[in-house]
Amino acid sequence: MPFQLASDYQPQGDQAQAIAKLTQSIASGNRHQTLLGVTGSGKTFTAANIIRNIDRPTLVMSHNKTLAAQLYSEFKQFFPDNAVEYFVSYFDYYQPEAYIPRSDTYIEKDSSINEEIERLRLSTTSSLLTRRDVIVIASVSCIYGLGSPEDYAQMLSQLYVGQQISREGLLAKLVDMLYERNDIGFTRGKFRVRGDVVEVHPANVDEDAFRIEFFGDEIDRISRFDPLTGTVAESLKKLTIFPAKQFVTPTDKLRRAQVTIREELDERIAWFESQGKLLEAQRLKMRTEYDLEMIQEMGFCSGIENYSRHLSGRPPGARPGTLLDFFPRDFLCVIDESHASVPQIGGMYEGDRSRKSVLVDYGFRLPSAMDNRPLRFPEFMERTGQILYISATPAEFEITNSVVGNKDYVPHKRDRIGVDESVPFAIAGAPRVESTQGASTVSPDTFDTNSPGMPLVVEQIIRPTGLLDPQITIRPLKTQIDDTLELCRVRIEKQERVLVTTLTKRTAEDLSDYFRDLGIKVRYLHSDIDTIERVEILRALRAGEFDVLVGINLLREGLDLPEVSLVCILDADKEGYLRSQTSLIQTAGRAARHINGEVILFADTITGSMQRLIEVTEYRRARQIAYNTEHNITPRSVRRAVQESLHLILKSGKKETSLREMTGDFDLSEVLTELEVEMQEASASMEYEKAALLRDQIMELKAGAGIDKIEPKRQPVSYKAAAKGMKFGKKLGKRG
């Protein structure tokens, strides 16, 4: 069925022209196009309309699981009658296999799988094989090895009433599909047998199970029923059962793989012995032969993914099968927050290779294990077709490639994909940077999608709310602390919130102590703050439990704080990662959801990044003001309910998935996952006190503890002397 967009809203502001232009560009066959959408302009709604217009299977990529969950929730609301799937890493905890030569330490693979995420992943692959109205929201997990779609499709079981098949034949087929027989614990991925009745709980379905009734060697009846109550919901004429795992291999390929694994093992042992590395040879022989025995007897082994090249019959060095292979060739790829996602795609391969090369060199794995890897960036680009990049700050890679006639892709000139370099679009009166293309400001009727070399970067800078980009003001460094204090007091009187960004953790902590001694309700936020505290601090800021948040890197994409009206950027002229063009634009965007939004840059000189921020802001404000005047629009602040304090709702002994509770601030499952990883790492490092503290915080999270119940990690320093006249900068100097 076609995509059916369900929404009470109509495109407003720049959305209509962006939808029309990008739909036209994709329909014309252009491979690369970019949506340059400012914060709060409704980029997700625009993407949903484009998907509806194009009507093709779509992959939406995000650079982290939290934003992926937010997108999943939004697209589920936009397309309730279509298949919207969620594909991210299903590990609650994952310790990869590794070896540290200098200490002769081998770290065995350890992991904990989230069953709900596993079900959603299986649902993704089954939807892609059976229908076209599919939208998959995925993290970078989609470029990791997943197995062959041909093998997966070959292993599924098609059943229908009247089919000639014995009960034993069906049971054998289910076992080959990695289902487990369990007549008592009937859960996902299990089947049970009662006389001539076989009941199967598919791995990709949560609420339904299926009953197959036999009459001799013929299927007499198929019905869908509730696995909890046993109530039959409906009778079926046919049924498709998908494999219980995504890594499934037909029997003939499994036998062939055992032969080729043995051949590679013999070659590698001979090489080690020729080099005098007898320990490595013996280690590899013992480990691999044990795995071969497990594969022969059980059909799988621990770490079977390391033999994926043999199981799929790929030649050495060939790319692995991934989720991308489950899509038809004409699918659309949407890369959200492309300035962060594109570099992430390019960086996954190198990190994986460096770890596995050590395992191969020291005899823990065969060289073929190197081919169980994420895609290289060129392989990703080869497998994808048409791409829509979405970002408020698209990088040089996206801008350069988004031109008519570019059927391949232009790598970054320094072979570093996605590095921020230049003005993202042409500005009237500003010098043009040669490496960029101008964004489209023409009407959809005159938008050229056919002439080679024409830019395909579409602006979306008019917000549906009529809000303007925040004003940019520059103040001197000398009085930045006193000025910030006074500005905070003014905003606090109006019951508005303030973000202050510094360059170091120490400065953030000291500044918050100084403000606290002067009566300001303030907290700091940086990477040393535990996961629960970070989430609770953001929630408490929105709820008004404090007024000022001091941090290092507050530009996190997707950080939605409508109550923030002022962003103070200290030491703005210190050019670098934290004060780059992308960072400054993203940080300034945190004040773009408030009608009184303002950004203060404290600097003695105007850097190139600052100048570009000012030019971009002036250009956008001019267009926004003109649009509001022409259409008689009065700007209004964004309104959104503050989420409750972190908690987990337990129903019938089952942890409720956080995907349904995602509202944009945080993902409960993500928080727990990060905490559990920290706890496991602390325990493995024998830091048992730290592990116990993390365990207690997890318990507080489950009990619904608020921000005030979390113990501080640092004793605040008193700056009462400063309140009596001592300058903040001098006080810092005395502390060394």
Task: Report residues per predicted region.
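N-terminal cationic and glycine-rich segments that engage phosphates or anionic surfaces
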Residues: 87-136, 140-413, 448-477, 481, ...
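Conserved helicase motor
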Residues: 87-98, 109-120, 141, 502-507, ...
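Pre-Walker A (Motif I) flank of P-loop NTPase domains
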Residues: 27-34, 56-57, 133, 496-497
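Intrinsic disorder/low-complexity segments
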Residues: 407-451
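Walker A/P-loop
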Residues: 28-50
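Conserved helicase motor "Helicase C" RecA-like lobe of SF1/SF2 P-loop NTPases
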Residues: 150, 154, 504-526
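Conserved pre-motif I regulatory segment
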Residues: 1-36
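Conserved strand-helix element at the start of the C-terminal RecA-like helicase core
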Residues: 57-69, 86, 491-513
